[in-house]
Every structure is written in C-alpha cells, then in structure tokens.
A protein has these predicted regions:
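Compositional signal for N-terminal targeting/processing segments
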Residues: 1-437
C-alpha cells in the first residue's frame, strides 16, 4: 500500500454491506462480526469477521486513517459456500516474497480448476443474475458463483479505472487470474447496472475478547501484539520517515517468531509463580524444538495453538499447557457498552443473546480444520470471581488447617518430590570407560 499511495482502495467484500463494514472497523480494537442473510429471522448467516490481522481489514483501516476512498467491489451471492484451500503458511512470504509465494500456489489453482473454469468463463451470465437478484431461479454451483463474482469485480474495477489514476486492489489470490482475464477482455462482461439489492438482514455483533480465537486467523496474542505494534506508526510518524528503506525496515520489524517465544516465556513465569515449579533452560530449549518439529510435520513453518499445547504438555505438564493456552488466546479488548448485541462464539457457530443457535459461514474460505482435541486435564474455573473463597469461608469451622504449618509441609513435600526425581535420574546414569581401538 505504501509503495503505491493509491487514489482508491478496492477490496473483495460485498458492496451492499459497505456501511456496516466501515462502522465495524471504526470500532477496532473491539472485535465485530457482520452477519447477513436474505431472511429476516435467519437460522444461518454468512459472516464477515472484522479481524485486525486480516489484509483486507487492515487495508481498509489504513485507507480510513489516510483519507483514501474505499470501494467494496464484490458480489453478494446467496447460499455461497466457497471451496476451502489449505494454503501454505503465509509466514513464507517474509522469506521468499509475495511474488514467488503467488507463483507457487497459483500452480495449484490452475491444476484444480483450470478446465472447468475455462468452459464456464463465457457461459455464466452476470446480467441474468443481477436482473433476478430477488428471485434467483437458477441454481449455481460454487465455481459458477465464483465466476459471477469475478466478472462483477472486474466490471467494478473497470469503472473505477475510468475515474481514478491509481487503484489498489486487495483480493484473494484464487480470484486474480479470472479477474485479470475479464479486465483484459471487457467484451466478455455484460453491460449492466452494478447496484446490488440490500440484504434483508444485516447486523453488527460484538465479540468478546474471550471468544477471539474463534474468529481470528492468527493466535489472539499475535493479533494483540500487531495492534500494539501498529500504534507506533501513526500518520504523523509515517510522514516523518524520509526514505522508503527506512519505512520498509520499520514495517518489517514485526516478528511472529519472537511473539511465540514471548508466549512460552510469559507462561513459564506465571507457572513458576503459581506452582513453585521451575522450568529450566534445557526444558525451554526442548520445548521450542519440539513445537517447531510438530509444525514442520504438519507442513507449517510456525506452530499453531495445537502444536504449542501438545509441546507444553509433553515437555512440562498440563498446568503449564493451560498457562500457554491463557497467554496465546488472550485478547484484552472488550466493549463493555451495550451498543451492540454480543454473540457467544464456538467453532461451529454462535449463540445470540436470546440463546438461539446460528450456523455461520465465512464469506472468505478458510480452513480451520476440526479443532484437534488436546488431552489436557479439565481446569476448574470459578462460576464467579471469589466463589472458591466464599466456599472456603462457609466450611472454615469444619476445616482443620493452619496456614503457616501448611506452607512448611507443602514446601517440604515439594523438596522431597524434586529430590526423589533427581535420585531416580542419577540411578539411570551409566558411565562407560572410553577405550580406544
């Protein structure tokens, strides 16, 4: 974006939810989810998560901060269930660059859809779809719906190019080749009014920080650290930077690997303080290596939450894994006002304030995979702050305990436990005499 300094930013989002998208982005860092449907009381909704770590949301946010016009150019297609792709870890872009990354994954797109898309490119009629938006009689499969969207986006871009000199397009890589094809062959696009009818149901929902991991693509801790990082680069700060090299050095200084290290280190300090167990440097080194190997085995460059928890559990214990879970999934921003209804999120869907379950479908495809079950012992939680203290007070007359003595006994038991483990380890040491041949 800072290389182009565009006159307008065009993004791959439906243009009949533009007002809601801009309003939700203005709420950041509070999280929002925009749900929309074609019935007034939907049981299923398409949704757009306002994810601060998403490139589309970030580009809109930068545009708003720098007074650059924003255009949402995508077509809203009913009952759209896009095919999902398990793309390579996008951390690779930091190492090989965006151009090489796109070249590599575009080979997969061509292999999967080339023949079918080539047959349908000139058969799917956008004009018929736009004329019959309220009552669409023809059924379209996912490939046909994608071609409708790509035609619509190309038509929208051609109109923008007649108005603006520099147009910055933020779009999914899977769509770029077809959008480019229609822009190079405008005669393939039917001449039609590009206005979309409004959805019957569009609503901005508030999402609590505790549910952040269900809508964010990154670990919530990563997203939080990114928000803190971007605070350092206000409009005035960016304008004071004198050379492009200085700008790119600053922008590229955010390091996800360093944030993963901080998650594990902060969890270590909390664990040691609460459980009085020491996690030594050798264990930490093994933990870093183990989580890295797990991620590589899953064909990822950086570990995800599952990898971090499995590593923590196996190298230290369940209690430490819970500390890692708390640090990795913590998103500290919560909107305490009642300006927006709050959805209670889960992996499969959401519950509105009345308790009604709503099935959610993401506007952009994204593979979560089913949440792998992490074999952690369930951690008890208070139903309300101070519950356990109240329960203790209720039964204090029947409890024989004296805290100074308890502390001495617990420390002694901890000492015996560690001493026993050390002795058992020593018994397993075997020394062989070195003999030369």
């Amino acid at each position: 974006l800072f290389k182009v300094f565009p006159d307008v930013i065009a993004v791959e989002l439906p243009n009949n939810v533009q007002e809601e998208v801009l309003e939700a982005i203005e709420r950041l860092p509070f999280l929002s989810l925009i749900g929309y449907a074609d019935t007034l009381s939907p049981k299923r909704m398409n949704f757009i998560p306002i994810d601060p770590g998403d490139s589309i949301i970030e580009s809109i946010r930068i545009g708003l901060e720098h007074n650059i016009p924003i255009e949402l150019i995508d077509l809203s297609v009913p009952e759209y269930l896009p095919p999902s792709f398990k793309l390579p870890d996008d951390y690779a872009i930091n190492q090989i660059g965006l151009h090489m990354f796109y070249q590599k994954i575009s080979e997969y797109f061509k292999k999967e859809n080339k023949d079918k898309e080539a047959k349908l490119r000139n058969k799917v009629n956008l004009k018929d779809f736009l004329k019959n938006q309220e009552k669409i009689e023809k059924e379209y499969d996912s490939t046909e719906k994608d071609i409708l969207r790509e035609k619509y986006m190309a038509a929208h871009l051609l109109k923008l190019m007649s108005i603006y000199h520099r147009v910055l397009l933020i779009i999914g890589m899977a769509h770029w080749e077809n959008v480019k094809y229609y822009m190079e062959n405008p005669e393939r696009i039917e001449d039609e009014d590009l206005e979309l009818i409004p959805h019957k149901y569009v609503k901005i929902y508030n999402i609590k920080g505790s549910d952040a991991r269900f809508i964010l693509r990154e670990l919530p801790y990563h997203t939080y650290r990114w928000l803190k990082f971007r605070e350092k680069f206000s409009k005035e700060k960016l304008e004071s930077i004198e050379t492009p090299e200085e700008l790119y050095t600053n922008l590229n200084s955010y390091n996800k690997i360093e944030q993963i290290r901080k998650i594990l280190i902060k969890a270590k300090y909390d664990y040691e303080e609460e459980f009085k167990e020491f996690v030594d440097l050798h264990k930490l080194k093994t933990l870093f290596q183990y989580s890295r190997n797990l991620s590589l085995a899953d064909q990822r460059l950086l570990p995800n939450l599952f990898h971090l928890l499995i590593s923590s559990k196996n190298i230290v214990d369940d209690d430490y894994a819970w500390k890692v879970m708390e640090k990795a999934t913590k998103y500290p921003y919560d909107d305490e006002s009642d300006n927006y209804e709050t959805l209670k999120m889960s992996l499969e869907g959401a519950y509105d304030p009345s308790g009604r379950y709503i099935k959610l479908r993401r506007h952009h495809p994204y593979i979560y995979g089913k949440e792998k079950e992490v074999p952690l012992k369930e951690k008890p939680e208070e139903k309300y702050p101070g519950e356990w203290k109240d329960k203790w007070k209720e039964g204090k007359d029947y409890t024989v305990s004296w805290p100074p003595e308890d502390i001495l006994e617990e420390d002694y038991f901890a000492f015996i436990r560690k001493k026993t483990i050390k002795n058992l380890k020593n018994q397993r040491i075997k020394i062989e005499e070195f003999k030369s041949s």
